[in-house]
Amino acid sequence: MLAVVWQFDVQDGSEDEFERLHGADGAWTALSRRSRSFLGSSFLKDLATPGRYLLLEYWSEMMVYEKHLADFSDHVEELKSQRAAMVRETLPLGIFDALDVPERHSPTWSVRDGR
């Protein structure tokens, strides 16, 4: 299992909109759910640094993740454009081998169909 990890530095006043875009019911997660390889995500807000967020997406296979990005490239670019208006900086932290992941029913775990 892969974990794709991003860090975002969100502009003051854009936090609510950013959280709606990337939250469990947001457009970014909805697009990811269209792939059977998408297993869920964790969306974290830094308590010590205002406006800093981490997004961890869990995918079953790298090839399917890459195919998903290619198949939905127009939609991905549209969402990235929306996000760019809200963030000062986007840092791709990397793609990791997920050794320990949250239970599928934990509060931060988003799954298909909202379950």
Kindly give the residue locations of the regions a language model identified.
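Short, well-ordered beta-strand segments in beta-rich or mixed alpha/beta enzyme
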Residues: 2-9, 40-70
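An amphipathic, aromatic/His-enriched active-site/gating alpha helix that lines ligand/cofactor pockets
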Residues: 23-40, 58-95
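Short, surface-exposed ligand-recognition loops at beta-strand->loop->(often short) alpha-helix junctions
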Residues: 9-22
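Non-catalytic surface loops within mature trypsin-like serine protease
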Residues: 10-12, 61, 97-100
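Glycine-rich beta-strand-turn "strand-cap" elements at beta-sheet edges
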Residues: 2, 39-51, 77-115
